Amino acid sequence: MDPVTHAASGALAMLAMPQRPATRWALPLAAFAAAAPDLDILAASGPLQTLLLHRGITHALAAAPFMGLLLAILARPLWRYDTRNAWSFGGVWAFMMLLVLLHIWLDALTTYGTLVWLPFSGERLRLNAVYIIDLLMTLPLLWGIWHGLRQEKKRAQAQGAIPFPFQDTASLTVSDGKPGVRLALFWSILLYPALALGCQIWHTQQMQASLAAQGRDIRQLVVLPDAFAPLFWRALYLEKLPARPADAPAWQTAVSYTHLTLPTILLV
């Protein structure tokens, strides 16, 4: 996913917590942690290295505890003894590790593939459920942040606190905006991905049935989200030629662009 989505998911996760450390650094640190695995692009010196290194070891499940530990050390304001409502270091470590895992999950939903099994396997995990930029995922996250901060501002002003956003502490650790914040987070990281994955599976089944009805010999088929998915998808398949000259390849890659709107039948 794009950096905005990753950062917004981290900030919203912090807002959704029942209680957070009373420091203005809480949301920025959570946003940074959720986007931190993408710092692997700094190790690449060109487009080819970026393609090879990106979504590598920093996106591996085995590396998540170590990434979480490093991020927890950097997030000292969250566990510092003089921070009101400070978390324990172990709690910050666990939260940061969960944000790294959230980053891995969101990237695995896309088509580019994530090396989640390193160092044990170089196979890339790709669920082909969402496009690399998906407003149906990003906008609810941004709305949730706006809604949560807006509710905190209202409550702070009603209680005579220092006017937001100049207050030095997030004193309102439990706000009336929590249900909306949590609903936005649930939609973007669980419900919408599940619906998109179900949509991808449905389109794949429809495409298989359509190609079989045409009598085509298809050996490999993949349905990918296109821009503005889940309304637009594209299907790629490997088809055996019925007859060929002696010097022609036995297989050809056939590309079919499918423009879909649910619940219409897949068109080839």
Give residue spans per PLM region.
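Anionic group-transfer/hydrolysis microenvironments
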Residues: L136, L236, P263
